[in-house]
Each structure stands twice: as C-alpha cells, then as structure tokens.
Amino acid sequence: INKINLNTQNFFLINADWLSCFKNDSFDLILSNPPYISQNDLHLKDLTHEPKIALASNESGYSDIKKITQQSSKILKRRGILMIEHGYNQEKVVKSIFKDNYFSDICTIEDYQAHPRVTYGILNK
C-alpha cells in the first residue's frame, strides 16, 4: 500500500461500512466519489485498471449512493453539505435520494463535457 511505501504519517485508513464508524454531528462537509455504475453495465469489461468493487454498485448503481446519503444525514452537522459524484444519467434519482434524506437546496454541477456529475445539498433537519 502506498502509505507504507511512501512512509506517510499524516493520514490514517479506516475499514468501515462507509460512514458508520463516525459519531453523529461530526462533519460540516462530506465529499464522496462512490461506486455508481450498474453491476450490469457493459463498459465494466473494458475497464481493466480498476477493481470492479471500486466502480460498480447494486441497485442499478445507486446502492452506495443511498447508503452514504442516509448515513450522512446522521453524521453531518445541521446545515452540513453532502457532495456526491454520480453518473451523467443519474441526476434525477440522486436528487430524489437527497430529498428523501432531509437535504435541501439541492444542485448539480456539470463536468467539462456539460454532463451532470456532482450533486450536493444542505442537511436541513
């Protein structure tokens, strides 16, 4: 692992079910790039440099996004911000997931090809 190879001391690794290891009301901002490709996506066979687990998620690519959003609504401080990268065709569903988990002021940022790529919202509970 690069942490060992580079003798890096300024970060640590945590093995957890996404955000489950953190206390409630711990963060002002969470930024995530979770797996968001459907397990059945034909493009996965062409991606040889990344492990499938880093790219693909169950429930048509939404399983990890749902879990992170649900957990974020507990560990973010009030008015905290959640930002999640997602597929270009997932904006509508991701916004719905945010709304279902007490996020408001939900917006999406486009990538350099003008595709919806990152959705963010403010925790409002």
Question: Predicted regions span which residues?
Answer:
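S-adenosylmethionine
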Residues: I1-N124
